[in-house]
Swiss-Prot record:
Keyword hit for Signal: yes
Biological processes, Gene Ontology terms: cell wall organization; peptidoglycan catabolic process
UniProt EC number: 3.5.1.28, 3.2.1.96
Described function: Endohydrolysis of the di-N-acetylchitobiosyl unit in high-mannose glycopeptides and glycoproteins containing the -[(Man)5(GlcNAc)2]-Asn structure. One N-acetyl-D-glucosamine residue remains attached to the protein; the rest of the oligosaccharide is released intact. Cleaves the peptidoglycan connecting the daughter cells at the end of the cell division cycle, resulting in the separation of the two newly divided cells. Acts as an autolysin in penicillin-induced lysis.
Top-level taxonomic group: Bacteria
Gene: atl
Name under which the protein is recorded: Bifunctional autolysin
Lineage: Bacteria, Bacillati, Bacillota, Bacilli, Bacillales
Domain writeup: The GW domains are responsible for directing the proteins to the septal region.
Organism listed in the record: Staphylococcus epidermidis (strain ATCC 12228 / FDA PCI 1200)
Signal sequence segment: 1-29
């Protein structure tokens, strides 16, 4: 629909993770009913970047128009204005240059679109122009003539190929508009001196001095340029040499004559975006409608209706009473309102910016929301999904520019189509109006983008899609809207498509508008063409320089006067061309940033065509003193630097772009980067007797396929590995793809880019990232179960900055996986759950084919204050004699409860109101709340959590029957007992009601619940299967067994909260058993319900989160945040809250590791620990020592290892490698070595000597002794001091503001992620957590 550390705990690596977003987003409805009140735009709960904060403020602050102040309008939108009087030509240009323009209009086609509410129409003209301009200058002393051949494109509607760009090279971001193929046009430019003076309309010839020869480029076809270079170019034919504008010389008068060439226009049918066309026939009057100060809809022309039309009437293809109602009412579509959000991402479609391939019909799936509520919800959750527009019965609101893709239809639909949501309406007329509005908007988009209506519903091909069709034919989503919503109004997609098709034919003047009488029922006539006010807008890919004398920049091409610009004599990108009557314009923007400046008249610029930049890897020589520019064909105002040194210097080129006939290259020389003309470069010649290059500058580049996360402390991204200084990056704390590795001397780099889009960000030093190997993703088709609350990420191994969504619902949810990738030793799967798509670690998934997955939460958070409404987990049978059922506990009287009597229902809420306690009944099949009954009217039991239990059974001859709900009554019996005797029963899930177990499955082709005591398990189903996992024993009152089928049992109390290593599993009568090893070495059987994957404890702080934040905010040394590398600032209230909110942190799979208990060993094997220590100097293969130290002194093994790695520089420090102290000096020449792996006693003023002294006094004569002995100090000094988690160390919730280990608000977050990565590397997870709870 979206961030850092001088301080560190001595035991942690202060690293920061990072990554990018994947557009596998789905459009979802607001979760709660919405009203029409204002909503603020809210960013995700994350550390907001400065730019995001600025964007938020722009959106959340209301804008009002002050009298006398013009509202800003997007320069890319061509807006009509009332005053269409053209400005006069600047006479000063007559004295500077001559422009001859010869143009012929070859084809014109008018398309009219009408605004249905305002009865307004805009005309659209398709122009095709071919212009040839000659500039001639005859030199009496030279006979050289240079000719240029230039290509300009002429696009025809029927030649459009939507797939043309499928295999194109990746284009530079700055070139956002796409061009079709070009036809060659020849231009000849010669230089001449002429003393004749001529003046015609748009043609002026200035006087020239025959004795002075002006400087003219050999290759410049534009006929106008600025003089930026002092060097002469007498031999090159591929450099655009600027031309002098100075007509006055100290010794002689010099005047240059020019004929300006305007490029041929692409012929397109792009209209003035996006007036919703009306159904009127012809334009009668035109008036400018000012922008609204509130809704700010687009400006449209008003038109008068016509009673008759020469066009034929449309014949509907389907019968539709609602469409007939719309036609009869002659419904008009409202204006399109724009409600854009600046922080929404902008990515081009797969064919480029402004190249959608169709439109998708969605509905919001929320009967209680409003259009404003939906938009507000979307803006708060845009990182999950956002769409282009919403429509209801009264309004059309465009929320994102349709030139760029949105996230509403899954990864494959997003890159192709415009996404539009239909907001639910509830009466006949409103629904009809919403269908009319959607059809009108859809037809407008199709017309604007030169697309023809073509339904994709049945064959997966076309321009009009439903979300269901996306799911069926493209995939990446499983939504089926809008069919169910349309059916609820006795309407169908076929009817809606017929209405869209009719609207399109009306807009393109192929059939008669509604409300007119057709006088010619024959085939539609061709649109008539106007002359003076036709507008044509086409995409362009060029560059331009605004002349010193100009008419300024125009916000829209309808403006009568331009505003002054500071972009004169700078090379700008041209992205669009517009022709309005006799006026022609270019839309110009910053070449590098893409910032749009506005429209400029073609006569006010020097224009050149430009091909898309391409990547190169070449080396050239360049002379010292040459100029590097920030853009190709740069001017003196765009100088990047000068080439330093003497003689030839080495220029490493990485990018190349052709401007007209000249070639420019981007690269680096002596640590400075920029663009330079190829004219100034020479190919580096190879020496005849090459010598071995110095190891300091030898470059080796290899392919790579890993992933990386940039550390918080980094030197930035490098454009090339030769750069001496990196650029600041905002890609920290995100997972990026690594495509290449480079070694330059003793420096090593990775080339990192966006995981999903493949966009390269630059080179980063290898020691500034956390790197993991990655295998190629593979396609799969598997189904898993996943718990609610688990995070979906946009990339595998994603960070909290790359969350795609959170699994919703209650109980196990179905996750459909379509892709799998292995990152180091961990496996990640991509799939969809409850309409949300993203990556999940396989650790959080369980296969349905296997028996129940255990709960990850063992100890529920205790309730400090008993709420008036409690959440319970019970099942109840309603008594025959009851006092009735209430819709609300506040109802004074109840309705009859007869139909609920003697039936079983679920209970999930309980509330005490006055002297009565009520429970909320819920249907066990549909989970629908039914109403409140008095607790005295029901018989209740506790009900456990439903778990998977796959098994095959036979029903005993004596049984109680099959029921629709566990513990059901006779009124809920599905099959009688006598029909089930000795029948096969296939179980799929199980649940405990009180102490009785019930199984859910199929028997006699019926599915329902049956008591486990009525079943006999097949002998083949009770066989053990291998299963490897380490659980935590969570029930001190239960037992373990040597044989689960025997009665002998032994108490689990001595093993409470210890780990239990499982090696196999068995399902016995619906109960899951695990067989494994206790810590004392015994091999036993334990029921799955007595085990948990992780042990979570909750500790109440006694204060509110807001109180804790206020204390932190008032500290003398304020909490710090690093929005940019190496730049610290005071964190604001929301940033501190985001970092301290334990509820948010606990739900993040990585950040929750700041609650990992560091004072609790996890009893990991030495073999597992050695995986982390491989290649770590003297610490390698010391896993046994770390394991012994952790057990002996009660410390987490991973924490202990991370501490040692930091202090020893990954086991390579001299302090760790050992030595001795003799006569106050460090030495390695004595017979004894002493080691210190935790930096204990190593004070900064003489760290090595002091550290070795401490080790010598402690007797640490080996690395293992240093590990075990040092662990005691670490435990007593840090962990055992009471702050036994990273969160406690940073925020000290027991006494906020005191004894805190860092000021960086993200210190705990970063170190938590480091712990999580270490666990991932050995294929384990943390087992013991303690989470503070605020009031």
């Amino acid at each position: 629909m979206a961030k850092k550390f001088n301080y560190k705990l001595p035991s942690m690596v202060a690293l920061t993770l990072f990554g990018t977003a994947f557009t596998a987003h789905q459009a979802n409805a607001a979760e709660q009913p919405q009203n029409q009140s204002n909503h603020k735009n809210v960013l995700d709960d994350q550390t907001a970047l400065k730019q995001a904060e600025k964007a938020k403020s722009e959106v959340t602050q209301s804008t009002t128009n002050v009298s006398g102040t013009q509202t800003y309008q997007d320069p890319t939108q061509v807006q009509p204005k009332q005053d269409t009087q053209s400005t006069t030509y600047d006479a000063s240009l007559d004295e500077m240059s001559t422009y001859n323009e010869i143009s012929s209009n070859q084809k014109q086609q008018s398309l009219s679109t009408d605004d249905a509410n305002q009865n307004q129409t805009n005309s659209v003209t398709k122009n095709q122009q071919e212009e040839t301009n000659d500039l001639t200058q005859e030199d009496k002393t030279s006979t050289d003539t240079n000719q240029l051949q230039e290509t300009q494109s002429v696009a025809k509607e029927n030649e459009k190929d939507l797939g043309a760009n499928a295999n194109n090279e990746q284009q530079d971001k700055k070139m956002t508009a796409s061009q079709p193929s070009e036809n060659q046009a020849i231009e000849t430019q010669t230089a001449s001196n002429d003393n004749e003076s001529q003046q015609k309309s748009q043609q002026v010839t200035s006087e020239q001095n025959e004795t002075a020869t002006p400087k003219v480029s050999n290759t410049n076809a534009s006929g106008y340029n600025f003089d930026y270079d002092d060097e002469d170019d007498d031999s090159s034919t591929d450099h655009l040499e600027p031309i002098s504008l100075n007509n006055v010389n100290a010794t002689s008068k010099q005047t240059t004559s020019y004929k300006y060439k305007e490029p041929a226009q692409r012929v397109t049918t792009n209209t003035v975006k996006k007036e919703t066309a009306s159904n009127q026939a012809t334009i009668d009057t035109k008036q400018f409608t000012p922008f609204s100060a509130t809704a700010q809809p687009r400006t449209v022309y008003s038109v008068s209706s016509q009673k008759t039309s020469s066009l034929p009437k449309y014949t509907p293809k389907v019968n539709s009473s609602i469409n007939n109602y719309i036609r009869k009412k002659n419904m008009k579509a409202p204006r399109i309102e724009e409600d854009y959000t600046s922080y929404f991402p902008k990515y081009g479609y797969r064919n480029g910016v402004g190249r959608p391939e169709g439109i998708v019909v969605h509905d919001t799936a929320n009967d209680n929301s409003t259009i404003d509520g939906e938009i507000a919800f979307m803006k708060r959750n845009y990182t999950n999904a956002f769409v282009h527009a919403f429509v209801d019965g009264n309004r059309i609101i465009e929320t994102a520019p349709t030139d760029y893709l949105s996230w509403g239809a899954g990864p494959y639909g997003n890159q192709r189509f415009i996404n539009v949501e239909i907001v639910h309406t509830h009466d006949y007329d409103s629904f009809a109006r919403s269908m009319n509005n959607y059809a009108d908007y859809a037809a407008t988009q199709l017309q604007y983008y030169n697309l023809k209506p073509d339904s994709a519903e049945n064959d997966g091909r076309g321009t009009v899609w439903t979300h269901a069709a996306i799911s069926n034919f493209l995939g990446g989503t499983d939504h089926a809207d809008p069919h169910q919503y349309l059916r609820s109004h006795n309407y169908s997609y076929a009817e809606l498509y017929d209405l869209i098709y009719e609207k399109y034919l009306i807009k393109t003047k192929q059939v008669a508008p509604w409300g007119t009488t057709s006088t010619k029922p024959s085939q539609p006539s061709k649109p008539s063409g106007g002359t003076n006010n036709k507008l044509t807008v086409s995409a362009n890919r060029g560059v331009a320089q605004i002349k010193p004398t100009n008419n300024g920049l125009y916000t829209t091409v309808y403006d009568s006067k331009g505003h002054k610009t500071d972009q004169v004599q700078k090379t700008l990108s041209v992205t669009k061309t517009a022709t309005l009557g006799n006026n022609k314009f270019y839309l110009v923007e910053d070449y590098n940033s893409g910032k749009k400046y506005g429209w400029v008249k073609q006569g006010d610029v020097v224009y050149n065509t430009a091909k898309a930049p391409v990547k190169v890897n070449q080396t050239y020589n360049v002379k010292a003193g040459s100029t590097l520019y920030t853009v190709p064909w740069g001017t003196p105002k765009q100088v990047a630097s000068k080439v330093s040194g003497t003689g030839n210097q080495t220029f490493k080129a990485t990018k190349q772009q052709q401007i007209d006939k000249a070639t420019y290259l981007y690269g680096t020389v002596n640590g400075k980067s920029g663009w330079i003309s190829k004219y100034y470069l020479t190919t580096a010649s190879k020496p005849s007797n090459p010598t071995k290059p110095s190891t300091n500058n030898q470059l080796t580049v290899t392919n790579n396929s890993g992933v990386a996360q940039i550390n918080a402390k980094n030197s930035g991204l490098y454009t090339t590995v030769y750069d001496t200084k990196g650029k600041t990056t905002n890609q920290i704390q995100r997972t990026l793809s690594v495509t290449k590795a480079a070694t330059l001397g003793d420096k090593k780099f990775y080339l990192v880019g966006d995981y999903n889009t493949g966009t390269n960000y630059g080179w980063v030093k290898q020691d500034e990232v956390i790197y993991n190997t990655a295998k190629s993703p593979v396609k799969i088709n598997q189904t898993y179960n996943v718990k609610p609350g688990v995070k979906l990420h946009t990339v595998p191994w994603g960070t909290y900055n790359q969350v795609a969504g959170t699994v919703s619902g209650k109980g196990d949810q179905t996750f459909k996986a379509t892709k799998q990738q292995q990152i180091d030793k961990a496996t990640y799967l991509y799939g969809t759950v409850n309409g949300k798509s993203g990556w999940i670690s396989k650790y959080y998934l369980t296969a349905p084919s296997k028996v129940q997955a255990l709960s990850t939460q063992s100890t529920p958070a205790p309730k400090q204050v008993k709420p008036s409404t409690q959440t319970v987990n019970q099942i109840a049978q309603v008594k025959a004699n009851n006092s009735g059922i209430r819709a609300s506990v506040y109802d004074k009287t109840a309705k009859s409860g007869t139909k609920y009597a003697n039936r079983t229902f679920l209970i999930n809420k309980q509330r005490t109101q006055g002297n009565n306690t009520y429970v909320l009944l819920q249907d066990g099949t549909s989970n629908t709340p039914l109403g409140w009954v008095n607790i005295n009217d029901v018989t209740t039991q506790n009900i456990g959590k439903q778990t998977q239990s796959i098994g095959k059974y036979s029903v005993k001859p004596t049984n109680n029957g099959l029921y629709s709900i566990a513990w059901g009554t006779k009124n809920q019996q599905l099959l009688a007992p006598n029909t089930l005797a000795n029948q096969a029963f296939n179980a799929s899930k199980a649940v405990y009601v009180g102490k009785d177990l019930y199984l859910y499955g199929t028997v006699n082709n019926r599915t329902g619940w049956i008591a486990a005591k009525d079943l006999i398990q097949n002998s083949t189903d009770a066989q053990s299967t291998p299963y490897n996992y380490t659980f935590v024993i969570n029930n001190s009152k239960s037992y373990f067994y040597m044989d689960p089928t025997k009665a002998n049992r032994y108490s689990l109390k001595p093993y409470y909260e210890q780990t239990f290593t499982v090696i196999k599993q068995k399902n016995i009568n619906g109960v899951k058993w695990y067989y494994g090893q206790l810590l004392d070495g015994k091999y036993v059987w334990i029921k799955s319900t007595d085990l948990v994957k992780e042990k979570i404890k909750y500790a109440y702080t006694g204060m509110t989160l807001n109180n804790a934040i206020n204390i932190q905010s008032r500290l003398k040394y304020k909490p710090q945040v690093q929005n940019e590398p190496l730049k610290w600032s005071n964190a604001n209230y929301s940033q501190i809250k985001n970092a301290m909110d334990t509820k948010r942190l606990a739900n993040d799979s990585s950040l929750k590791y700041q609650f990992l208990r560091l004072d609790q060993p996890q009893y990991l094997s030495a073999q597992a620990l050695n995986k982390l220590l491989k290649g770590k100097g003297v610490l390698e293969n010391q896993g046994a020592a770390f394991s012994q130290a952790a057990r002996k002194y009660g410390l987490n093994e991973i924490y202990l290892i991370s501490h040692a790695l930091v202090e020893t520089g990954n086991g390579t420090s001299q302090l760790a490698k050992g030595g001795d102290v003799s006569k106050g000096k460090f030495t390695t020449k004595t017979g004894h070595k002493y080691h210190n792996v935790f930096g204990i006693g190593a004070f900064d003023n003489n760290a090595l000597v002091d550290g070795i002294k401490y080790a010598k006094n402690a007797g640490w004569t080996s690395v293992s002794k240093a590990i075990i002995g040092g662990a005691k100090f670490i435990g007593n000094s840090y962990v055992k001091a009471g702050q036994n988690t990273l969160y406690k160390m940073r925020w000290n919730p027991a006494n906020p503001g005191t004894h805190q280990y860092a000021t960086d608000i993200n210190w705990a977050n970063v170190n938590a992620q480091v712990l999580k990565q270490f666990y991932d590397k050995i294929g384990e997870v943390g087992k013991y957590f303690e989470i503070p709870i605020y009031k």
